[in-house]
Amino acid sequence: MRLLCGLWLWLSLLKVLQAQTPTPLPLPPPMQSFQGNQFQGEWFVLGLAGNSFRPEHRALLNAFTATFELSDDGRFEVWNAMTRGQHCDTWSYVLIPAAQPGQFTVDHGVEPGADREETRVVDSDYTQFALMLSRRHTSRLAVLRISLLGRSWLLPPGTLDQFICLGRAQGLSDDNIVFPDVTGWSPQASVC
């Protein structure tokens, strides 16, 4: 009898936990006319939105750049550089083309079995702005991140609204949006 009660309790808890795990919203499609050769180059990361960001993270985000280099096989090598005081933090990864143009899987260069991440370019005019959306699947949840990229710090009218609306369509609130602190920041090749 105890075994039966224990099994019933375990199954009940499993149902409760499954009900509390939100189903991720469907991702918007990647940009249909994506052109990798026009997308490559240096971008400033002007804003980030994600379900793991909180208001207290705003002070931690400094301005940074992302450089996309297109290889012959359609992969992008991506290098990021963020200044923190007098030193530079850098990290890199590879975007591997998926079935649709503008859609990629992310290779962080870690061991097999690491969390799976997919990313896509949702919109871009290639010369001024780009919106990218990434979703990383962990064993417990899906981590969503939306990046607002600009070739300069000046965005076309409506781009910021488009970024915020994309976040809201993915169930994010204004508290999930962070912008880098650019106080006193200027790109210096000697630092990074």
From Swiss-Prot:
One of its GO terms (cellular component) is extracellular region. It comes from the Eukaryota. Keywords: Disulfide bond, Secreted, Signal, Transport. Residues 1-19 form the signal peptide. InterPro entries: Calycin, Lipocalin, Lipocln_cytosolic_FA-bd_dom. One of its GO terms (molecular function) is retinoic acid binding. The keyword Cytoplasm does not apply. Gene3D superfamilies: 2.40.128.20. Disulfide bonds join C88-C192. It is found in: Secreted. The keyword Signal applies. Pfam families: Lipocalin. Binds all-trans retinoic acid and may act as a retinoid carrier protein within the epididymis. May play a role in male fertility. Belongs to the calycin superfamily. Lipocalin family. Monomer. This is Epididymal-specific lipocalin-12. It comes from Homo sapiens (Human).
